[in-house]
Amino acid sequence: MSTRELVVLGTASQAPTRTRNHNGYVLRWDDEVILFDPGEGSQRQLLYSSVTATDLTRICVTHFHGDHCLGLPGTIQRLSLDRVPHPVAVHFPAGGADYFTRLRYASSFHETAELAVMPIDTDGQQIAVRNGTLEARRLRHPIETYGYRLVEPDGCRMLPERLSAHGIAGPAVGELLRVGHLDVNGRRVTRAEVSAPRPGQRFAFVMDTGLCDAVYALAEHADLLVIESTFLASETALAAEVGHLTAAQAARVATESGVRRLVLTHFSQRYPDLSRFAAEAREHFTGDLVIAEELMTVGIPPRRVPSAG
């Protein structure tokens, strides 16, 4: 059975704390296992999680500030150490290619893993992945930064009562689904007549950024939104100055974008009590709210089921 879930490796921002590792997030999306923003210590955090290096199929880096990329050397070397048999795609801002090369070859090692290096050089760039499309959008931060959005294509679900009414059963259902129409007793029945739309699932990953149109574009109708909330509202001016969000801002984005499950993360070390983030976000968001914790697993909500009409 396919699995779609987020595994949190770390939740700290610029500086880790005794209880918070640098950033690191793994998205299980069926056969795709994507590591986002491996900060310092990510390789060790993987050992404590349900994810192994050999599971990884793709790495996505939003930008080259240390808390989002210093785990790359260890992770990349681990891919070779464990002799990962499949290519691992790597995406990052094209303007940071030199940083990536330095991190990739930060020390001597026997490289056996195959990396498919695919930099992001265009706002809105799309990459075909298994069971979806990965899109990158340029965010507002002091250095080149991209957020990522993974979208499953919309589909349809067959309605048993309508199939039965037309006398369609067995292999004929598969033919109708595949071809789009079926001739039954001298009448052509279309797939639309016996099915209802099934919206694809949507996942969004928004790290270091000030408010901008791209934040909303990434978050739009996301089933699961993972978004930075470095500061509380008392530091709104500072957040804007350094290109970050507050918990209140992240929560409002989620509400205005129709997000179903909101995961707040990337907390400043100045805040030992994360319950304040939950309280602030709850003032603006009534959906499913998660305050990320190390080694937490967060499921992607089931697909939306619209009315059959």
Swiss-Prot record:
GO terms for molecular function: 3'-tRNA processing endoribonuclease activity; zinc ion binding. The active site is at 67 (proton acceptor). Keywords: Endonuclease, Hydrolase, Metal-binding, Nuclease, tRNA processing, Zinc. It catalyses: Endonucleolytic cleavage of RNA, removing extra 3' nucleotides from tRNA precursor, generating 3' termini of tRNAs. A 3'-hydroxy group is left at the tRNA terminus and a 5'-phosphoryl group is left at the trailer molecule. Its cofactor is Zn(2+). The keyword Endoplasmic reticulum does not apply. Its EC number is 3.1.26.11. Binds 2 Zn(2+) ions. CDD domains: RNaseZ_ZiPD-like_MBL-fold. It is an enzyme of class 3 (hydrolase). Zn(2+) 2 binds at residues 67-68, 208, 266. Pfam families: Lactamase_B, Lactamase_B_2. Zn(2+) 1 binds at residues 63, 65, 141, 208. Zinc phosphodiesterase, which displays some tRNA 3'-processing endonuclease activity. Probably involved in tRNA maturation, by removing a 3'-trailer from precursor tRNA. Belongs to the RNase Z family. Homodimer. This is Ribonuclease Z. It comes from Salinispora arenicola (strain CNS-205).
